[in-house]
UniProtKB/Swiss-Prot annotation:
A motif (Nuclear localization signal) lies at residues 1090-1097. It is found in: Nucleus. Pfam families: HPD. Residues 455-474, 627-646 have a biased composition (Acidic residues). The keyword Electron transport does not apply. One of its GO terms (biological process) is cell development. Keywords: Developmental protein, DNA-binding, Homeobox, Nucleus, Transcription, Transcription regulation. The lineage of its organism: Eukaryota, Metazoa, Ecdysozoa, Arthropoda, Hexapoda. GO terms for cellular component: nucleus. This is Homeobox protein prospero. Residues 1398-1556 are annotated as: Homeo-Prospero.
Amino acid sequence: MSSAAAAAAGAAGGALYTNNNITNNNNNNSNNNNSNITSSSNLSPTAATIATTAAATTATALSGSISPGSRESASSLLSAAFGNLFGGSSGENVKRAVRATNEAGPGCHQWAAQSLDNAMLAAAMETATSADLLNAAGLVSSLNTSKLLNNVNNNNNNNTPLSNGNNNNNNNASISPGSAHSSTTKGGSSRRVSNCSDRSLDGNLAAAATTAATDAAGGSPPRAASVSSLNGGASTQTKQQQLQHDLMAHHMLRNILQGKKELMQLDQELRTAMQQQQQQQQQQQNHEKHQQELHSKLNNNTTTNNNNNVVSESINLIEDSEMPEIKIKSEPELMASATQAPHSPHGGSSNSSSSHSHNSSNNSIASNGSLRRKSSDSLDSMQREERATPATTVEPQLQNEVLPTKKEAVDDMLDEVELLGLSGHGHSRNSDLESLASPSHSDMLLLDNSKDEVLDNDDIIEDDEDDDDDDDDCIETKRESNTSGSNCLKKPGMELKRARVEHIVSSMRCSPSATAQAGQLQVNGCKKRKLYQPQQHAMERYVAAAAGLNFGLNLQSMMLDQEDSESNELESPQIQQKRVEKNALKSQLRSMQEQLAEMQQKYVQLCSRMEQESECQELDNEHEQDMDSMEQEQEQELEQEQEQEPEPLQQHNDDIELSHSPTLSKSTPKESSERAGSSSPYIEATEQQQLLRAAATMLLPPRPICSLQMMSKMMSSKLQHQHNPLVGVAHPALPQGFPPLLQHMGDMSHAAAMYQQFFFEQEARMAKEAAEQQQQQQQQQQQQQQQQQQQQQQQEQQRRYEQEQEQQRRMEEQQQQLHRQQQHLQQLQQQQQQMEHHVAAAVPRVQLHPPARLPTRMGGAAAAAAAAAHSVLKSELSEKFQMLRQHNSSSNSNNSSSNNNNSNNNSSMMRMSGTDLEGLADVLKSEITTSLSALVDTIVTRFVHQRRLFSKQADSVTAAAEQLNKDLMLASQILDRKSPRTKVVADRGLSGNSGHPGAQNGPTPATQSAAAMFQAPKTPQGMNPVAAAALYNSMASPFCLPPDQQQQQQQQQQAAQQQQQQAVQQQHQSAQQTQQQLEQNEALSLVVTPKKKRHKVTDTRITPRTVSRILASGWRCAAQWTGSCRSSCCRTTTTTTTTAAAAAATTTAAATEQQWQQQQQQQCNAGTEPNGSRPGRRHILSTATTTTTHDAGVFAHLSGHTKSIAARIQSLFAVQSILQSACGAGPHGPPHGGQPTAAQLHHQHHHQMQLSSSPPGSLGALMDSRDSPPLPHPPTMLHPALLAAAHHGGSPDYKTCLRAVMDAQDRQSECNSADMTFDGMQPTISFLKQQQQQQSQLSGAHSVPMVNLWSLAPTHTLGTNVETSWVETALTIITIYHTIYDIYTFSNHCESLTPLHSSTLTPMHLRKAKLMFFWVRYPSSAVLKMYFPDIKFNKNNTAQLVKWFSNFREFYYIQMEKYARQAVTEGIKTPDDLLIAGDSELYRVLNLHYNRNNHIEVPQNFRFVVEQTLREFFRAIQGGKDTEQSWKKSIYKIISRMDDPVPEYFKSPNFLEQLE
């Protein structure tokens, strides 16, 4: 930024020094002009006049011996060069400069070329801030003025040194602090912006133009002091003075961009300025006389005098102590007169000599605490304009003199700056030189009016914040640009400089305010803090400074390499050495600046850490204490420094010599530190106090902003303290000639020590806080541990308490169980006693007590309770069934005890039997175990005992028959209500069984059992009527037949098995036909809950196995009652018994005649001749069907609780007992010993087949105890086929066992099929096709089951009456059997399960469909029907199955898209990088969804399909196709072509059973 200003300054300097021979004609004008300026007392600065006079001054500088056209061209070129600095268009300025050069003529081409180059460089740097450019231009004019003044002094031959010194001092006093409204300082000290903002020119007073010439040209008032050498003409010390000039110029520029302006206590400056104005008038008179003698040949004096006398100055003071701004009134009418007045080329000398005097006057300003700011500004402007007149009197002397070279001019300027520092008493340097660096708003507005170019106010405000390092660029650039146009060197010019230095020194010694006001330096800045506003952007100034410094140095080297090469030839080795030292010092300065930046970073970190951790009130107190302590220390240091400063400074001013000091390059840290402390105590004290207080109040929420502001304030103040000593000469305590460039070391060390101390304090505080936090954390951790321990203890106590409670509960439960067991045992004993009592009293009280229920497998307690509960004969049937349900519920917990009870009861009953009943007992035992014959015998026996008490037997038999039919109908209705099936199915079953029960074409659709084995035995045609007499003791029994007859029986058994299989097939066909009528009318849900068979405790059905169990436990009691019946019957007459039996048989024969005929016809069709010698004997083979029941059955309930039925059919069996007694049949049956019969062998063989053909899962080991083979029993009179049916040979009980085992494995499993038809004889997996073929072959077969009542060869012949009564009795028994079978069949029909072919989809089908998804994703309906053969498909379930696969695909594609997008976000580039392994997450999710229990191994091709699908989705998403509407359709087409054939084992109907 500053490089552009340097370029412009070089252009201006070149123009001034190139035309060094054309400035002789305007000297007298300047003298008259200056004298006129001093006479004005009413000063009123205006913006337009200052801007116009600046342009005029530049034009006058170019005027001389050149023609008027060339003068105008040079003026326009310089205006173009500086016009680029004030916001104008760079292109227009360059073009304007080119045109002016072409019009100037050949005499000005050499200067124009160089000026044009500089102007173009300035145009390239138009981005620089206006503050930098204005400062640079001001310095250029200051340097030019110093050269001109030096030449004037040389011409005067040191005639008036004292007046020159006085003149400089007086002029310097006129530089007052500018208005404070343009910028404010940090820490409460206001910064001076410009002094030209308070000036305005009145009317036609054109002489004031010389005062503000360089203000307009440079953007700020010229404040650099051009002081000649202090050595009174000694030419031997010229080189040393040049070196000092270089150093002083460097320091001055640093102070320009860094210092802070003081806006207070300006009345002292005004008083000194008034005294110096009188001295200026005398000095101006002397100069006028001298110039008139030397330049009497000049012709332009009268014109300039007339023009200059017109100008008058006035200052309008605005007396407003509250407002910091100073309003400036511009008078546009002054512009015309100002622009017409030609100005002296040396008009800037007054400004250049102002810095020295201002230093001394500003010293008094700092020491005085008054606040009269407005008056001081006005008087400052008056003094400045009065100083301009004596300075211009010296300028005409330069006409006959040759200007010095670039080197000498710069050295002279540095000497003057050095003397300025000596006379400034230290602290005035800051405010003076600071005013050079910062023009105010009024300056900018004046320049805008003159140049007709607009400047941004923001750029002007930012001028105050420019970098402090741009001074290096400015000083070197201006120094070389000032001398760029001058190539000749003459030594006599140095004499004038020496004379001026002597006068300046004498004037400083005579100054009344130099020593008197030195002791008033100590000012408590904190009390004045309210007058200032903090500056907010100090950090940005320092950041921008480094860039400007480096760029300016590079630009300097680019522009002036040629001039340096020429000037280096004229320089002595000492000067070159000093230049090297100066460069070294610059490098040191840069390194220190870097260190300072590092310290700033550390401080920022420290502040951030402090802000994060200091949030408690303790930190506020600590900050306040630190602030107070540091303020006290600083105040003490300031007092000591201010006491030590005045005396050395005064002594040093008195002993100033121009000789080079041998200790120029020597310095000590102590001296530098003292120098640092004495730089600006007021600024340091006020800023540090404010910064410390700001740091103490930094605990507000926006902490980082506060910390940065505090840091910026501290760094700005420290940088000012660091660089302020570089302005002027060395500290008074230092040796004479000590290079001030090294003095900033003290400030750096002081700042570093301060920061280090503050850093250590912060570290200590942070360590303390960290220790406190650690202690708090430790305490919290201890508290948490204690709480956890307490919680654990509480939990342990609670656990112990719960354990104790559980133990107490267990103890109580055990005690309760023991108590219950004891009570139960007591009840059992009581029940046993009651049973014994009832059995003992059964014979004498047969009418009062109904037959007690036999002990069954359900338990003796239940049987005894049932016998006690049903003591009343005329109780309702509903009440009986209700009591039965209660007994069944209590029977499960009493199984073990009931078995023992049964044995006890049986043993007690056996003890009551006599020897005469042994034969009958054996026969009854063998018969009861396999059929209902024993039960019928028991009923008949009890009926005989009751019959003796009735007088009318015929009426009793008739009533019994009628009541039997009614009770059977009532029982069927009750069973219908308790069936879980729908009423429609029950009605169908009733209609199917209503006609002829034995003539059914097949079982109901839901029936999966073969024909029952409870059909009544019938005697074949041609049977001997007397054969019944030998029914129990005939040696022709099937088990006592010769071997040939046994072979025939075995053949009959095989035939019965074949017929049984045919009946099963016929049932399948019937079920299929019925299922065709049923159809699924609505769509199913996704998962259908399986309708499992209800295992109710109150189930009223009965199975053959249950009947066998019941009869096996109660055969002894029945046999005992039968024996007693026979003994009592022996005392009656045969005729009476026979008559009663015949009457009873006659009454019931009519009811069963039709059934008998049908059954006889079936026997004729299905029977075979076992022996050819007996043509009339035909054996009726019975078939067994598979049923699905296992609980206690209906018949046991009827036999135990329907007393009316039992009472009315007892008469039907009385004939049998009477015939046995009358015929004299032996009581003993076949012997127990001997070889096992064929039935027993078949039972053992079939049990092995059952275990071997059991499904996996150790079915044989898990079978219920009921399905174990029964106890060995004597041979029965039943056919072996009937025994085979009873012993698991296709019996319903076997299938019940199979389902019970499967339900025990997993009742809730979806994979258990309740539709299997395993009967123990066929393989586990059935083949539907073969079954259908067999069913079609046997479609006409009848499935009415029968029990063959074997007819054996009689050994005794009875009468006709006996034969008739036996036939009638047999018919009655057959009727009872058919009635019981109807009830049993109906119960099976009501509780049957789903048939083989069903239209209902179950959860097992859903699981199968999920597994099929591994092979096919888009199956057709034909494929689905092929792989679901057990489903009868219709439109509803087909759509349901298709919907399942649609849902499968939806889940599949959702997962694919999810993981594809995840892969895109993870940064995968190509689809080939996507690989699906067995342990990948996507593969695991899919397997968990479709193969939850790992039923099958996932095929390898499915992994390939998943991988391809994922890649397709990845390509689509990566290519951006997912934004389209139907972007997935193409992927669906690709995946649909990847289906594979499903394995064949999915077609198996048994596949669902294998899934678990």
